[in-house]
Amino acid sequence: PSDGILPRPVPFSVVYEDDDILVVDKPADTPIHPSIGNYENTLANGIAWYFEQKGEPFVYRCINRLDRDTTGLIVLAKHALSAAVLSQAMRSREIHRTYQAFALGETAASGTIDAPIARLNGSLIQRTVDFASGERSVTHYRTLAHCSVFSHLELNLETGRTHHIRVHMAYIGHPLLGD
């Protein structure tokens, strides 16, 4: 079992499940895993509850992550072998992720943002573009629709960093709605 993850009825939807993986739709305002101030309201708690209700053993093996305020698909491995295979596929970029977001202002029809991301000095959570010490981060975007106030974007990440889309869109002067 996953130590420290208490089974709790946190809502999510199962999109796909087989003997190897579980794919769920994570709602917005749901942290992925327990952290300071979030011990019983996370997706991990909900997944533990799900398996407890089925009477199946549970080890939390989350393959991808999304920010707390982001909704989308999360892939979980149901055993060590599928975790190893899926983790390697993520590292070698065989798994492609496409996101949609709304950003302030009118963005170009398409673009690529190639700017390294690092932790903001003095913060464990916040990230920023940092050309001196950041890790390579690349975002490709395409504008699906726009008006004078905001743009609806489709985004693809070459790399995966914490707050990647949020940081890159703010960097080019088009912060995500709500930021």
Predicted features and spans:
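RNA pseudouridine synthases
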Residues: 1-179
